Amino acid sequence: MRTKIITEGTTKIEVPVPDENSSFPPSSVSVFYNPEMQLNRDISVAAIASFSKNAPEYTYLDALAASGIRGLRIANEVGLTTSMSDWEEESVRLIEKNITLNSLKNCTAIKRNANVVMLDNSFDIIDLDPFGTPAPFLDTACRSVRKLLCVTATDTAPLCGAHKKAGIRRYGAVPLKTDYYPEMGVRILMGAAARTLARNDKAMTPLLSYASQHYYRVFVEVKKNVISADECLNQMGFVSQCFNCGESRMQNGLAVHIEKECPECGGKTTMAGPLWLGSLHDRDFCDDVLEECEKRKFPRAVKLITLCRDELDIPMHYDYHKLCKSLGLSARPTQELVLTLGERGFEASRTHFSGVSFKTDAPLREIKKIVIQLNS
């Protein structure tokens, strides 16, 4: 295996060099390093630094370490006691070399199955960052974690409805391919975490979640409390979507009655869920993370988290371009629509999900009227 030494953040790491003509993920190397996920890791460093700033004794597990870059950065740049587990012998050897390369005394490399590691040990912070679905590791992670659970899912198609049956199997929820599909995916992932934690009498508070490139990422604070776990489940629910007029409605609860006909146009409605209908972000936490990102000079992370922090705290969003297309109109600047909605007495904001997405508490019929007026 050919390797080279790179620097990410302030951490040096020896990483494998795949063949130039290899596929992605590269089959030519047994240890996987993905440079495209640096934004994910930058945000993780800032978020975990913010979360643990008054608790330097917290322990951190990178459950699916691969090259070890995530755990190495947490140990080196945040200073937490870090464990990194991987089943591959070459991964563990490379992680141990990188621990020495960075002169880290607070790191351990473990050659074991991630689920076994989490069954045998508890950690304050657990990070699941698989290539693919986190579903096979969610049960043991929720059992083992004490304070903060961080989860990445790169299987976006099952989460957002493109591969519906896979979504049902993996996450115990019916996904739906809608105009707001990235948020659908994040909320199904969040809902799966909430239900799995509740089975272990634990509650969660979402601190930060986002969709970026080809993955979804969530950070949730964990609390062992039966009453809080019950209250957490009250924020689960379902979405009723009409594909005829575009109307979507949310209904809280795990056993709900969804009208089969759209109350706006009489068209057939389709149900998605159960999924998380509560907040996706904690604004105070986002402020702390932004401060860390600015201090550490993570400009891409600053831009993304600023959008997350400033999003309207309601479920689901609209795609302005698709809305205009359905009305046979050309789209004007999204910010113009957001400002106009505010002038008409509604709450509205841009979102991080796309450059043309927005959230508002205005009814869809009012949004359509305003869009038509802006184009007249």
What are these regions (language model features)?
Residues 1-376:
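SAM-dependent transferase fold signal centered on methyltransferase-like domains
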